[in-house]
Amino acid sequence: SGSGFSIEKMIRQVLKGIAILLALTVGTLFVFYLNRSDPWGQIPGKRLPGEAITEAIEDWSFTQQARGVTIEVRPSAPYSVNISCLFHDGAFYGLATSIENRWMQYLIQDPNIRFRVGDELYLGRATVVEDPQLVEDLFETLAQKYRGGADRTPEQKARYRFILIGSR
């Protein structure tokens, strides 16, 4: 009976240590989450750090090699996400996987954005592409760039929205 007590006590101490370690880990992650700026994977970020380039962009060809763009919407309470992007016919576009995305709702309310391509941060305005032929052309360009997706069904394509990203 004496050895059972010490094993029970040891198990309680180990469980207490695990609980403390878990609480510290969760607390640390919470602090990082609250103080983030850039988005991380699917977790949205806040205000993108850095000074934005304010000059109007005339030549968007520098975006051709970009695999993605980080876009910040809602200037009053910045909300940033990583999205796919493409260069098509001299213009720069981003892709939303759904019009229902929170960031898209913010963009519709206020088209003023900040966006980062590579290491540079820019001021811009974004508008949702409505022209059906242009949307079809953008899907073709997207399929070439990312090597896939050309076989999307019309129902799948209907969920996506392209945004034209321009200078402010």
Question: What spans do the regions from the language model cover?
Answer:
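Short, structured beta-strand-loop surface elements
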Residues: 38, 45-46, 56-57, 100-168
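Feature marks short, highly hydrophobic, charge-poor N-terminal signal-anchor/signal peptide-like helices
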Residues: 12-14
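N-terminal amphipathic/basic-hydrophobic helices that include classical n-h-c signal peptides
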Residues: 1-9
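Hydrophobic membrane-insertion alpha-helices, especially the h-region
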Residues: 16-32
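Short beta-strand segments
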Residues: 63-98, 113, 125
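Short, conserved active-site entrance elements at the starts or edges of catalytic domains
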Residues: 32-79
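A short linear-motif detector with a strong N-terminal bias
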Residues: 48-51, 63-65, 72, 92-94, ...
